[in-house]
């Protein structure tokens, strides 16, 4: 554990049951934690920083992360957290249950423009799992790899912690592999439950839609991560809710 992380955890303990808040700042002397005062009217439920604290942190160096805690709460960013994180364009570090969870500032899961290898179906899958607390590797992938004798999903899923489950056992958070104009599975979608999936296909914005007969016919197999737990879907749901109310 770094000195910065120790300072973050100590500050959260001192503030509990209220939420702590602060910044990780990169200074000429190295990375340090800059604690702030939570000026929220409901500090046990929300956090709010003063503009003065934000300015003082910026004067110390480059802000590299915003930090807050969920005392007795859940280790995923809330709907409000995700909305504010995207606005801040910063990584957010969350203190919960004596640990620090670090979240990259990924775009909202819905409404993304498609760019192969940058914001495509695998990026959406990877970012959704990141918000759920599971890290998936990034890797280079040429466009149309499925037409060049490659089978990237089937060749890599087991090595990254997933295993195949029967389609009849589908649970929210499972990954659907589909054949989209291909003889091999070349498209990943997140099953959301209630007959819905979350995915990103070329020339469209990422979206939730019904898991219709069309997509059921295209489905090759269903996969689940070994570290997955049902409550992890909360992290994905919170982002979907944040995006639906984002103005």
Descriptions of predicted regions:
Residues 1-65, 71-103:
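Conserved beta-strand-loop surface patch within small alpha/beta domains used
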Residues 209-247:
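Glycine- and charge-enriched low-complexity intrinsically disordered segments
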Residues 136-141:
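Surface-exposed patches in mature extracellular/periplasmic domains of secreted proteins
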Residues 116-132:
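Active-site nucleophilic cysteine motif
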Residues 142-206, 211-212:
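...with weaker cross-activation on analogous glycine-rich loops/strands in unrelated enzymes
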Residues 110-115:
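Second-shell loop/turn segments in exported
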Residues 58-74, 205-206, 210-221:
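Extended, compositionally biased flexible segments
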């Amino acid at each position: 554990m770094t000195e910065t992380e120790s300072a973050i955890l100590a500050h959260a303990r001192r503030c509990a049951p209220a939420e702590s808040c602060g910044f990780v700042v990169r200074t000429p002397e190295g990375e340090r934690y800059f604690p702030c005062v939570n000026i929220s009217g409901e500090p046990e439920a929300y956090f709010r920083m003063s503009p003065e604290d934000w300015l003082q942190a910026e004067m110390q160096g480059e802000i590299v992360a915003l930090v807050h805690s969920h005392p007795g709460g859940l280790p995923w960013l809330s709907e409000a957290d995700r909305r504010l994180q995207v606005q801040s364009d910063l990584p957010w570090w969350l203190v919960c249950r004596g640990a620090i969870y670090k979240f990259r500032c990924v775009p909202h899961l819905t409404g993304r423009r498609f760019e192969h290898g940058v914001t495509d179906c695998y990026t959406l899958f990877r970012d959704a799992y990141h918000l759920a607390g599971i890290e998936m590797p990034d890797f280079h992938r040429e466009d149309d790899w499925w037409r060049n004798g490659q089978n990237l999903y089937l060749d890599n899923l087991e090595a990254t912690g997933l295993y195949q489950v029967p389609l009849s056992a589908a649970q929210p958070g499972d990954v659907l592999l589909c054949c989209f104009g291909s003889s091999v599975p070349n498209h990943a979608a997140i099953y959301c439950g209630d007959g819905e999936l979350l995915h990103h296909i070329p020339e469209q914005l990422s979206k939730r839609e019904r898991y219709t007969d069309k997509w059921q016919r295209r489905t090759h197999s269903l996969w689940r991560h070994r570290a997955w737990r049902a409550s992890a879907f909360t992290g994905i749901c919170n982002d979907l809710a944040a995006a639906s109310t984002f103005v």
